[in-house]
Amino acid sequence: AIFEEGAFAEGTGTASRIDIIPTYKQDILSRFKLARPVKVVLDGGNGAGGEICADILTKLGATVIPMFCEPDGDFPNHHPDPVVEANMQALMARVKEEKADLGIGLDGDADRLGIVDPDGRLLFGDEVLSLYARELLTRKPGSTVIADVKCSSRLFNDIKAHGGTPMMWTTGHSIIKAKMQEVGAPLAGEMSGHMFFADNWYGFDDAIYGSARFVALFSAQDKPMTEL
């Protein structure tokens, strides 16, 4: 074998280091504007995305109250699963304490999110997807919106009621993304908090982008979260 014989290729090459974070932030910021001020409590779950997300939301114009946004792989505050109520207790309490418009929780690698309303209630994943879908369908009526099999019939009925075409599909982020490409769906989501955006984004699940998008769509409403 090459390793055992030490028969490695020889030569010289180059390596470069590029910081993509400023470009990533600017890409998201260029896509949204807040219609009015929004107060957000952000629970980063001590994962990879908290600090970046807090900075983006602040630059977008939101008032951001950060919690557990420093990366720490020991996850000292709670397990970073933002769709489990037991993990979101501190966020739920802080939203009420601060009288915030909403709370956002991120998972460890920032591809899933949870949303908390001003009463401190953690929304189900299909409720979050329905709010993204309603906004999308005002711009792109008739669009296909994909949801995994764990989502309730309430979501599928809501998509229909707002002029969309709901599609139920198998759970799994790679499976959902493939189906989105196959049928040209601009939006998809799972009960687990994975939200996939091919409309005004690149077709994958990104909770930092999803946070900015949610805050922007909420800012365009004249109702509190509890009435949406």
Locate predicted features:
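Conserved active-site and cofactor/substrate-binding residues in soluble primary-metabolism enzymes
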Residues: D19-T23, A48-I52, A86, A90, ...
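Short, charged, surface-exposed secondary-structure boundary motifs
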Residues: D74-H79, R134-L136, I176-Q181
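Short hydrophobic/aromatic-enriched beta-strand-loop microsegments
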Residues: G61-F68, L122-E127, G163-T171
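Phosphate-binding and adjacent anionic-ligand microenvironments
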Residues: L102, K140-L228
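Predominant activation on well-ordered alpha-helical scaffold segments within soluble catalytic domains
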Residues: Q26-L29, A54, T58, F68, ...
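Gly/Ser/Thr-enriched, mixed-charge loops and adjacent short helices
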Residues: A1-E98
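Active-site flanking residues adjacent to catalytic metal/cofactor-binding acidic residues
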Residues: L42-G45, L106-G108, A147, G189
